[in-house]
Curated annotation (Swiss-Prot):
Cellular compartment(s): Cytoplasm
Involved pathway(s): tRNA modification
A GO molecular-function descriptor: sulfur carrier activity
Source species of the chain: Photorhabdus laumondii subsp. laumondii (strain DSM 15139 / CIP 105565 / TT01) (Photorhabdus luminescens subsp. laumondii)
Signal peptide boundaries: none
Protein name: Sulfur carrier protein TusA
Keywords: Cytoplasm, tRNA processing
Gene designation: tusA
Family: Belongs to the sulfur carrier protein TusA family.
Assembly information from the UniProt record: Interacts with IscS.
Length: 84
């Protein structure tokens, strides 16, 4: 099975940061990305297991994959397509 985390357009390492900093950094990073690009997020804050999926739902980005069984947690987010 191929590793979906291997070729993101950008990587954001939020390890060592605690809520709300990881989600704030994700939001800032995604804002500067093109629609459809993929962001790999590395995190070690347990709150991200709730916050990253909630952020994606609220902002309508796609949470393509998440791996939270071991550290660092990994999340792969696709920026939503532009709306006309």
């Amino acid at each position: 099975m191929p590793d979906v985390f291997t070729h993101p357009d950008k990587t954001l390492d939020t390890q060592g940061l605690r809520c709300p900093e990881p989600v704030m950094m994700v939001r800032k990073t995604v804002r500067h990305m093109e629609a459809g690009q993929m962001l790999l997020i590395l995190a070690d804050d347990p709150a991200t297991t709730r916050d990253i999926p909630s952020f994606c739902r609220f902002m309508e980005h796609q949470l393509v994959a998440q791996e939270t069984e071991q550290m660092p947690y990994r999340y792969l987010v696709r920026k939503k397509e532009s709306q006309l």
